[in-house]
C-alpha cells in the first residue's frame, strides 16, 4: 500500500496535476492527461517511458 504522505506530494510529471490510485493499487492515474503510472513493490514509477495511455474504457 502506498504511503499517504507520499501520495499527498506526488504530482503528474507532465501537467503537475493530482494523481489518484486505481482500484487495484497498481497504478497512479492522471485524469487530465489520461496517463497511468505503474506502482511496483509499493514504489511509484513516475517516468513518461513507463506511463500507459488510458483508453476510454479505462476511465
UniProtKB/Swiss-Prot annotation:
Coiled-coil regions listed: none
Gene Ontology annotations for the cellular component aspect, listed alphabetically: cytosol
Disulfide bridge positions per record: none
InterPro entries registered for this protein in UniProt: Trm112-like
Protein family (similarity comment): Belongs to the UPF0434 family.
Protein name: UPF0434 protein Mmc1_0910
Native organism: Magnetococcus marinus (strain ATCC BAA-1437 / JCM 17883 / MC-1)
Upper classification of the organism: Bacteria, Pseudomonadati, Pseudomonadota, Alphaproteobacteria, Magnetococcales
Amino acid at each position: 500500500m502506498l504511503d499517504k504522505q507520499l501520495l499527498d506530494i506526488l504530482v503528474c510529471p507532465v501537467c503537475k496535476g493530482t494523481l489518484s490510485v486505481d482500484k487495484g493499487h497498481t497504478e497512479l492515474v492522471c485524469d487530465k492527461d489520461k496517463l497511468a503510472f505503474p506502482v511496483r513493490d509499493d514504489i511509484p514509477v513516475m517516468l513518461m517511458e513507463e506511463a500507459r495511455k488510458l483508453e476510454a474504457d479505462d476511465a
